[in-house]
């Protein structure tokens, strides 16, 4: 699906820019990658498995994007991926997992946190030098669960709360390098991860009844926020956690 938000900005706003979308092979990450590609950027996406890369290869929205397999738990793999990119203007962290119902197990909890939070820190640290050279920016993916708890997903909730605080901390730490660090905080977005909830009429209705804009969000809605945060229009914006949730948090 084309992203209508791309037309909000000057044509080819991101021409000459290299964007790395970690976890950009599907869902919100793919929506963000497709939007930047449509806006003229060179985009590289990563996935954790060969199957992820196959999905990306079959997505027409990602046509023209390069890709590689990276497990964000592997510091060496993360650094090799970033070292292979000559120049980098924007790092976008979308890699994440959610294991509903099993995250009360400490081992599962630790795995989720290692991917969602520690993985975000690994990519930020590995990208710092290249982003310093370009005076670029980082966009992390927080969540509405950065703001409230989730009894079935304590690992996911803790990791996304951590991403929020990490974003604020790195915004301060990296400011002297000319690097801005922000995050999007998606609400209920229609992706494969939320497919079970979308298919359950009673649960979907409960979500929509609390959402003032009364619809499920789409990956391109989150992409619109990312296009702004990476743009010159946001040159004085750093340390922000931007909800993209149709008003869910304020209702």
Name each model-derived stretch.
Residues 2-10, 148, 227, 238-251:
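Short C-terminal tail/terminal secondary-structure segment
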Residues 175, 180, 237-239:
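Short, small/polar-rich loop/turn modules that mediate ligand/substrate recognition or access, typified
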Residues 100-113, 207:
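Substrate-binding pocket helix/loop in short-chain dehydrogenase/reductase
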Residues 25-26:
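Conserved glycine-rich cofactor-binding loop
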Residues 94-99, 247:
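Conserved NAD(P)H cofactor-binding loop of Rossmann-fold oxidoreductase domains
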Residues 143:
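Residue(s) in the substrate-gating loop at a strand-loop-helix junction
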Residues 124, 159, 167:
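Active-site helix of classical SDR
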């Amino acid at each position: 699906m084309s992203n209508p938000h791309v037309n909000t900005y000057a044509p080819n706003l991101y021409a000459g820019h290299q964007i790395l979308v970690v976890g950009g092979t599907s869902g919100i990450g793919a929506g963000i990658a497709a939007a930047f590609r449509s806006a003229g950027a060179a985009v590289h996406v990563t996935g954790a498995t060969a199957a992820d890369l196959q999905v990306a290869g079959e997505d027409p929205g990602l046509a023209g994007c390069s890709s590689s397999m990276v497990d964000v738990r592997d510091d060496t793999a993360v650094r090799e991926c970033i070292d292979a990119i000559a120049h980098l203007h924007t790092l976008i962290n979308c890699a994440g997992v959610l294991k509903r119902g099993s995250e009360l197990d400490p081992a599962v909890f630790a795995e989720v946190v290692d991917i969602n939070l520690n993985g975000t820190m690994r990519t930020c640290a590995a990208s710092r030098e290249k982003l310093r050279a370009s005076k670029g920016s980082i966009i992390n993916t927080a969540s509405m669960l950065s703001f409230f708890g989730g009894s079935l997903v304590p690992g996911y909730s803790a990791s996304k709360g951590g991403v929020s605080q990490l974003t604020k901390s790195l915004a301060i730490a990296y400011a002297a390098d000319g690097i801005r660090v922000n995050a999007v905080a998606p609400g209920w977005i229609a992706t494969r991860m939320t497919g079970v909830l979308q298919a359950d009429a009673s649960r979907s209705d409960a979500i929509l009844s609390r959402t003032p804009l009364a619809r499920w969000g789409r990956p391109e809605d989150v992409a619109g926020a990312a296009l702004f945060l990476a743009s010159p229009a946001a040159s004085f914006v750093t340390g922000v956690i931007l909800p993209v949730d149709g008003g869910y948090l304020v209702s």
